[in-house]
């Protein structure tokens, strides 16, 4: 297209024209329509790339169906947890059982952690602001961290009470009431576990199933596993005490053993939370594989400042500087690199800066990749 013809199109005021054969909508993440004062060359380059992150996500991108499912799971589980917690407090009081009462306290922690998770999910859905320009995505991660820490606090209290009972030996337990209450507790924990369980599909798209799991639901699920272990310990103790009342020391011993096991179940969640907060490379995204994929794009000579991190466990983000050879179409490189990254790794956001390649990049320490 000649320069004069371009200028004529820019100055023209009659009907709106589309240069790609489709209506481009301004305000919905699309390239604006040509009007006086706009750079037509920039419009043509943008049209050539045919790639825009917000347009891909669509207007309903903030209504994440996975997040909605997580909220429904937590609502149902928290309602079940609250109702049975009240019943277990009554049963523990009637049975004079510390194990049942501490199991009820564990349920209280489960309930509180689910409320924290629901609050964090609501916070993470709030739009970005000028101050919080990434949005509130990591409120979910902070909620999971608080849930894990609350497990540790309650577990410490349970261990302390179990040791205290072993030392004093001054307690009596109603084995029958304890047996009924603990049996119901096991059943309720199984129901809550099934409600919160997240099953992944059998094939992979470059991410692991753990990446697809909601961290708040995972934290709540671990809470339920811990409480299930505690309830099983109480059930075993109740069964023994029902037939052998003189073996009352079984109650604090079971509480002590199963409380220790709870701590181990929190380590995987804590590891994921720390990885996100420290902006480490997310699980399921291999740094070397990403680098090799970018270098395989035609025209790419080198790259530097490759950073891969995550807003949350399931939202990996990438930024990189790509150096291209002379006479290479920058928009073609940008389009190819972006589409390959999205196709293989499903990044939430990709930011690529195109630069001209120079020979001194080979010896520049700042341009070298990070160590293993």
Curated annotation (Swiss-Prot):
Homodimer. Interacts (via lysosomal targeting motif) with AP3D1; in AP-3-mediated transport to lysosomes. Interacts with TMEM163. It catalyses: Zn(2+)(in) + 2 H(+)(out) = Zn(2+)(out) + 2 H(+)(in). The chain crosses the membrane at residues 141-161, 176-196, 221-241, 250-270, 305-325. It is linked to Zinc deficiency, transient neonatal: A disorder occurring in breast-fed infants as a consequence of low milk zinc concentration in their nursing mothers, which cannot be corrected by maternal zinc supplementation. A large amount of zinc, an essential trace mineral, is required for normal growth particularly in infants, and breast milk normally contains adequate zinc to meet the requirement for infants up to 4 to 6 months of age. Zinc deficiency can lead to dermatitis, alopecia, decreased growth, and impaired immune function. Residues 1-140, 197-220, 271-304 are cytoplasmic. Phosphorylated at Ser-296. Phosphorylation at Ser-296 prevents localization to lysosomes. Dephosphorylation of Ser-296 which triggers localization to lysosomes, accumulation of zinc into lysosomes and lysosomal-mediated cell death is induced by TNF-alpha. Belongs to the cation diffusion facilitator (CDF) transporter (TC 2.A.4) family. SLC30A subfamily. GO terms for molecular function: identical protein binding; metal ion binding; zinc ion transmembrane transporter activity; zinc:proton antiporter activity. Zn(2+) 2 binds at residues 53, 304, 321, 355. GO terms for cellular component: cytoplasm; endosome membrane; intracellular membrane-bounded organelle; late endosome; lysosomal membrane; mitochondrial inner membrane; plasma membrane; secretory vesicle. Zn(2+) 1 binds at residues 106, 110, 223, 227. Keywords: Antiport, Cell membrane, Cytoplasmic vesicle, Disease variant, Endosome, Ion transport, Lysosome, Membrane, Metal-binding, Mitochondrion, Mitochondrion inner membrane, Phosphoprotein, Transmembrane, Transmembrane helix, Transport, Zinc, Zinc transport. GO terms for biological process: intracellular zinc ion homeostasis; response to zinc ion; zinc export across plasma membrane; zinc ion import into lysosome; zinc ion import into mitochondrion; zinc ion import into organelle; zinc ion import into secretory vesicle; zinc ion import into zymogen granule. InterPro entries: Cation_efflux, Cation_efflux_CTD_sf, Cation_efflux_TMD_sf, CDF/SLC30A. It comes from the Eukaryota. Changing residue 54 to R: In TNZD; decreased protein abundance; increased protein aggregation; no dominant negative effect. A motif (Lysosomal targeting motif) lies at residues 294-295. The modification Phosphoserine is found at residue 296. NCBIfam families: CDF (TIGR01297). This is Proton-coupled zinc antiporter SLC30A2. Changing residue 296 to A: Decreased phosphorylation. Increased localization to lysosome. Residues 162-175, 242-249, 326-372 are lumenal. A motif (Mitochondrial localization signal) lies at residues 51-54.
């Amino acid at each position: 297209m000649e320069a004069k013809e371009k200028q004529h199109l820019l100055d023209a005021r009659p009907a709106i024209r589309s240069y790609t054969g489709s209506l481009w909508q301004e305000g919905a993440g699309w390239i604006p329509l040509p009007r006086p004062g706009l750079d037509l060359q920039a419009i043509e380059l943008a049209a050539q790339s045919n790639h825009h992150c917000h347009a891909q996500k669509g207007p309903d991108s903030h209504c994440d169906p996975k997040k909605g499912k997580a909220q429904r799971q937590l609502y149902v589980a928290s309602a079940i947890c609250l109702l049975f917690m009240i019943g277990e407090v009554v049963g523990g009081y009637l049975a004079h059982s510390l194990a049942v009462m501490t199991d009820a306290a564990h349920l209280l922690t489960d309930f509180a952690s689910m409320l924290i998770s629901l609050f964090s999910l609501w916070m993470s859905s709030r739009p970005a602001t000028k101050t919080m320009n990434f949005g509130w995505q990591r409120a979910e991660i902070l909620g999971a961290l608080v849930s894990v820490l609350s497990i540790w606090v309650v577990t410490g209290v349970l261990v302390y009470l179990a040791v205290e009972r072993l030392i004093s030996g001054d307690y009596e337990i109603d084995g029958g009431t304890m047996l009924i209450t603990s049996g119901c507790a096991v059943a309720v924990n199984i129901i809550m576990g099934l409600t919160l369980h997240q099953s992944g599909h059998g094939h992979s798209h470059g991410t692991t199933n753990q990446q697809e799991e909601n961290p708040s639901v995972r934290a709540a699920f671990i809470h339920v596993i811990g409480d299930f272990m505690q309830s099983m310990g109480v059930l075993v103790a109740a069964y023994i005490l029902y037939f052998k009342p003189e073996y009352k020391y079984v109650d604090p011993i079971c509480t002590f053993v199963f409380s220790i096991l709870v701590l181990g179940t929190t380590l995987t969640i804590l590891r994921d939370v720390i990885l996100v907060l420290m902006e480490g490379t997310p699980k399921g995204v291999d740094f070397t594989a990403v680098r090799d994929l970018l270098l395989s794009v035609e025209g790419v000579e080198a790259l530097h400042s490759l950073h891969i991190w995550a807003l949350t466990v399931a939202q990996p983000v990438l930024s990189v500087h790509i150096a291209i050879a002379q006479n290479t179409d920058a928009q073609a490189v940008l389009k190819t690199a972006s589409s390959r990254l999205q196709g293989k790794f499903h990044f939430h956001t990709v930011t690529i800066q195109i630069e001209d390649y120079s020979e001194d990049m080979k010896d520049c320490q700042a341009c070298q990749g990070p160590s293993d």
